[in-house]
Amino acid sequence: MVLSTQASVSLESVAQAVLPDPGRGPLWFQLYLQPDRGFTQALVQRAEAAGYEALVLTVDAPTSGVRDRERRAGFRLPPGVGPVNLAGLQAPTPSALGPSQSALFDGLLHHAPTWDDIAWLQSITRLPVLLKGVLHPADAGQAVSLGAAGLIVSNHGGRTLDTAPSTATALPRVVQAVQGKAPVLVDGGIRRGTDVLKAMALGASAVLVGRPAVWGLANAGAAGVAHVLRLLRDELEVAMALTGCSTLAEATYALLDGHDEPAAGAI
């Protein structure tokens, strides 16, 4: 499980609910760097103290995208629902902007993560740091050279920049750049067990799912989430059996087009 900085429940409460379960999976904290480094460091310290096992640093979303569906639907968070882990964070004081300046380019982007920020984060925590939002092989190579514990190929489900490359397109390029030096996970568009198998065939070490779990939660609470995960697992097992894979290690690129490796220029 990966808990977001923006979660509406405290990171400590989630850890207390998850960690005692003997059948649980990993518990990671998805971190958004805040303009106030002291506040960011306090978040990291809270995650460590609560028992989180890794930090997932989002590197590609210094601002929210243009979410037309939400606007058309008139979506608003219900009263009382908000990012409780950011309570007490003071917003940066806006400075006066000239006619040729932008609140985005002369404000928010000054706080976007840099390679130096990643090195700083690694220096203040004992937890492994994974980078989420990597789509370009050059960035993947740089991240590994800086000691990233893993990469997550992600385009935020197309909600941040709707014309960003699909994760299925970016994944094999990133895997090639990493050359096995770190695990490469992927999210975005995982809806069926067959999608999981395709991701593994493209080189993913694991997949992450977001919206399907939320759909299950909205329909049937915790039982709905468990049902969604069970469906994905059952579909994956059937897909593996029908493609002759007895283990996930046997899911290679050959499953997708009959060749062991992508053709030159295919990715």
Which ranges hold each PLM region?
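Contiguous N-terminal and early-domain "leader" segments and peripheral loops that mark the onset or edge
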Residues: M1-L3, V129, Q142, H227
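N-terminal capping/small domains of soluble enzymes
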Residues: M1-R37, Q41-E48, L232, A251-I267
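Alpha/beta enzyme core
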Residues: E12-A17, D21-R24, Q34-V186, T194-W215
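Alpha/beta catalytic cores of nucleotide-metabolism and tRNA/nucleoside-modifying enzymes
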Residues: S166-I267
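Short amphipathic alpha-helical segments at helix-loop
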Residues: W28, N155, L217-G221
